[in-house]
A protein has these predicted regions:
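Conserved acidic donor-binding segment of nucleotide-sugar-dependent glycosyltransferases
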Residues: 108-122, 130-135
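A charged, aromatic-enriched C-terminal amphipathic alpha-helix characteristic of glycosyltransferases
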Residues: 119, 136-155
Length: 155
């Protein structure tokens, strides 16, 4: 959404770095034309047009990802967020990499059901590259995230 505009700009350097290190990696990002222009020169990056909540929910139920990215930069708006991306990523079978801040820092168990990182682009490039290249770790974290989501739903 447009509320993540700054994060999409912040991610560009990270995505470019991972693409250079991992030729098998590809990325999808939601964004308006401004975001398309920002990413159009990068190979293996698709910019998807924003969609209604109903369509997005259907998309996350039928689309599979390996890794989801949920950076949160400093802003008043981000202070009020819930861990929604965790559930989106679980629906898509993915492990998430999250900024180590609320709401994720109190919700994600580090390297058990997700990865928490400070907002240091080099750390994101390294962690993302490791997960891209380590299918067993990706799968383990995604399985644990799914178990965590189900345990919360059954409380």
């Amino acid at each position: 959404s447009s509320s993540h505009r700054d994060e999409k700009y912040w991610l560009r350097h990270i995505i470019e770095g991972v693409l250079a290190l991992c030729p098998q990696a590809s990325f999808e990002i939601f964004g308006e034309h401004e975001i398309y222009k920002l990413y159009r020169d990068l190979p293996r990056v698709s910019v998807l047009h924003p969609m209604t909540w109903q369509n997005y929910l259907a998309y996350t139920k039928t689309h599979r990802l390996d890794i989801g990215l949920a950076p949160l930069l400093d802003s008043g708006f981000n202070l009020a967020r819930g861990p929604v991306k965790f559930y989106d990523f679980v629906r898509m079978g993915a492990v998430g990499i999250y900024s180590n801040r609320s709401p994720y820092s109190d919700f994600i168990e580090q390297n058990v059901n997700g990865v928490l990182l400070e907002n240091d682009p080099q750390k994101w490039i390294k962690a993302l590259s490791v997960l891209v290249n380590t299918e067993t770790k990706r799968s383990e974290l995604a399985r644990n995230a799914k178990k965590h989501a189900y345990s919360l739903a059954n409380q």
